[in-house]
Each structure stands twice: as C-alpha cells, then as structure tokens.
Design a protein with these regions (language model features):
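Non-ligating segments of multi-cofactor redox enzymes
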Residues: 1-451
Length: 451
C-alpha cells in the first residue's frame, strides 16, 4: 500500500527562483539591521557575503594585497565560466529586489534599449579605469555597497536617491535594466559569461513563437539564435514557457561551430568605444579624486587620506554600527572625491573607540588598528577661550571626559593635553561647556597611526 502513495516532488523551479533571491535580500537587510551596540558575531556573515563580488577583490589587488578570502570571488568567477551569471540570477541581494519588482510589475523590454548594448563594455572599462586610478566610486555602484548605503540612508531618515532611481528604471523601462546595463558587477560577470561552458539552447523544432524572448528578464533569449546570450541569469523561464520542448544546456565546445562561436568576440566599434572610455576616465579621474575640503576627522583606523578615498566604497556600514552615531556621510559640498565618505564632527558626538567600524568595513579603508596606535587627530586648547586658562575658573570637564587620560592639570585649574596619549576621539571637544567653537578642538593629523 505504501508504494501506491504518490512520491514527494520537489517544488518547481519558479518556487526556488523566487525564494533564493528573496532570501538573499532578506538576509542582507536583517544582518544590516543588527549593526548596533553590542555588535553580534553573526553579523560578520554580511562581510563574507560581500566578498563574493569580484570587484572587491580587484580593489584589494589594486592596492597590492592578496586577501585570504581570495577563493570566494574566484569561486563565483568559476561558476560564471561554467554556467553564466549565477550570482546575478540567484545570489545578488539587489537582484533579488529587482526580481521581486519584476514579479509585481513585469514589463517587456523596449526595442530602443538594444541601442545601449554597444556602450556596456565601454561603461565597465570606464569604471574599472577609475578604480585603477584610485577612485572609490566604482565599488559604490556594486550591488552590496549600493544596497547597504541606501538602506543606511533610510535608517538615517534620508532619501535613498540612487535606490529609488534603480527601482524607477525597473518600473519605467524593465525590471533588470540596472543589472544588464549599469551594474559594474553584473557587467563584469556578463563579460566572463561570454566564455561560459554551458549554454541554454532552444529545442529542436523551435516554432519561433517568441514566448522565451518575451518572458526573459534580461533579453538573453533569442529564438532566432542558436543559444542564449551572456546575459542569461539561468532563471529557467524560457524552459517553462516553451510549448515545444525544454531548453537544453549544452557544452558549447561539443563540436557545433555555431555554438562554439557564441558571443565571445568584440567588434571594432566596441574596441574604439572602449578606448574612448579609457581616455574619458583618464580625464575624469583627477576631478573625482582631488579632495576639495580640508583634511577631515576620520573614524579610528582610517588609512591615510589618499588611500582611504581610493578604498572607501561609501557603503555606510561604519555609520550604521557606530554606537554614538558620531560617524556621518560628508556632504555634497565637500566635492566628488569626499562626498558620502565617513567623517566625524567631534563637537556633535564623540567616538567611543569601540572599533566596530573596523570590524564591518568591507574594503579595508578603515583598517584594524589598536587604540594605542590610533591617531584620529590631536586635541588643542585655545587658552583665550578656555575657562581655566583665561578666567582661572575650575572646569576640567575635558579632563573628566577623556577616556585615554590624555589631559592633565598640574595646578588643578588649567588643562594640558598629553600628545602621546591623545587619539583624537573628540570626547573633550564634545563635552566642553564653551559655546561653539569649543575651547578645546580636535585637529586632524596628516598621519593617522602612531609608529
């Protein structure tokens, strides 16, 4: 009798296609929401998850570092060489958001969008050239950093302009427009996918009904072609909608010259456009990299300013995890090189030296540095404004507030800064009772670490 019972069947592909990307988005949001004091150990999952992005690896390699997690992005690149854009279709949290958007309001891909395809490779090369020349904006556009920064803006009560633009493009043009045409990580995977081993091939006896072309979220399915393009997300929609037979995944090296040719080659126009993009990047790099504001007070462990700006992806995780919320994004008036990078206004809030910002930074812009070697800045006392120095009044609030005991007062009236102990946390400036400017101010230093 047991044999007469129907066997359990796995859920259909459409179930997993919706569940897994949605879980990727949910995990990212839930982990980021736990970036509070005290910081749970399991939040490091988000750091490791972010390391799937090969752009992050390129950022480390650019600075001459070979990270210990090298195998993670290499594994994703190998998976892409095997089957295509696995990460974009199944593991990307921003892709999960856009997939949900597509399930709510699906739109056919407009014909005019194809005119943008020749500019995708030049756009990617432009961004990679900016990264090579020391700009952190390329990483900002990658899915993990963009999503976490925009979510952080929501938590700060600000408008997530870029995320709204991504969603708006999905509503107006088609849901995966960002993934196909603008996302640097997606474009990099698309380039690698040109050499993928397995490719989806239309079934024998294709009647050219066009259903696969209409249902494909990236426009990778073409019934007139012998295979899907490098933008295939392996979602399986074409296979589900095909009225004739299932699409086959075939080895493009199986001897079929039509399949072997694939979409690997680059046209002459593509090469010329790419060269132009490199020239434009060379001209734009100085504008995007040149600081237009004075040396700001950075979080503890921040690298020297030029290297910090080249590494910081503006993801906002340090701001999210800061217990005193002293870390803020720099305003637009600071210029494109510094815009949205983290800085501290000590008068408004002090750094508690928890070093959580060092633990969550995915790019190494905020390095792991012991407190005793940290030098965010150096406190300086304006004797003409200090109550103890100018009026002989007993105050010493700066001495009481200092967590490093870097302020002494031999005469019990006039405070003095011990430069060898001061780390520039800003507790003294934050607690000073003198109206702005405070009588004691933390001045950023050229070097941010003690030898």
């Amino acid at each position: 009798m047991l044999l007469d019972k129907p066997m359990y069947k796995l859920p259909p592909l459409c179930f997993w296609r919706t569940l897994i990307p949605a879980l990727a988005l949910l995990i990212t949001i839930s982990l980021l929401s736990k970036f509070n004091y005290p910081l749970p150990d399991y939040t490091s999952i988000l750091l490791w998850y972010s390391r799937l992005d090969p752009l992050l690896l390129l950022s480390f390699l650019r600075n001459g570092e070979i990270p210990g997690w090298l195998w993670l992005p290499l594994a994703m690149l190998l998976a892409t060489l095997l089957a295509g854009r696995v990460f974009c279709g199944w593991l990307c949290p921003l892709g999960g958001l856009l997939a949900l958007l597509g399930s709510v309001r699906s739109r056919p891909i407009p014909a005019w969008v194809d005119r943008l395809k020749p500019f995708r490779v030049p756009w990617l090369l432009f961004l990679l050239a900016l990264m090579a020349w020391g700009s952190g904006w390329t990483l900002y556009l990658s899915p993990f950093h963009l999503l976490t920064e925009e979510l952080n803006r929501i938590w700060l009560g600000q408008i997530p302009w870029l995320l709204l633009a991504v969603v708006f493009s999905g509503l107006v043009i088609f849901p995966r427009f960002w993934c196909v045409y603008l996302c640097p990580t997606g474009l990099l995977f698309s380039i690698v996918s040109r050499w993928r081993l397995l490719r989806a091939k239309p079934p024998q006896g294709c009647i050219h009904c066009g259903r696969c072309e209409k249902i494909c979220p990236t426009g990778a399915a073409d019934p007139a072609a012998s295979q899907t393009t490098a933008d295939c997300l392996l979602c399986g929609r074409c296979s589900e909608k095909c009225p004739v037979d299932l699409f086959d995944f075939v080895n493009h090296r199986s001897g079929n010259p039509a399949l072997a040719a694939g979409d690997v080659g680059f046209t002459r126009r593509e090469v010329l456009r790419s060269g132009t993009a490199l020239l434009v990047a060379g001209a734009a790099a100085p504008l995007l990299m040149k600081p237009t504001a004075a040396n700001p007070l950075r979080p503890p462990g921040a690298l020297e300013e030029a290297e910090f700006l080249s590494r910081c992806s503006r993801c906002g995780r340090c701001m999210r995890v800061c217990p005193s919320k002293c870390i803020r994004p720099m305003p637009f008036s600071s210029g494109p090189a510094m815009f949205l990078t983290p800085y501290i206004i000590a008068r408004d809030a002090r750094c508690e030296l928890t070093q959580y910002c060092q633990q969550v930074c995915p790019t190494g812009a905020i390095g792991h540095l012991p407190v005793e070697k940290t030098l965010m800045g150096l406190a300086e006392i304006d004797h003409s404004r200090c109550l103890g120095w100018s009026q002989g009044k007993l105050c010493l609030l700066c001495q009481e507030q200092c967590p490093r005991h870097a302020i002494e007062s031999p005469d019990k009236i006039r405070p003095q800064v011990i430069a060898d102990l001061c780390v520039g946390c800003g507790a003294c400036e934050n607690g000073c009772p003198v109206d702005s400017p405070a009588a004691i101010v933390v001045k950023p230093q050229p070097s941010r670490s003690r030898k």
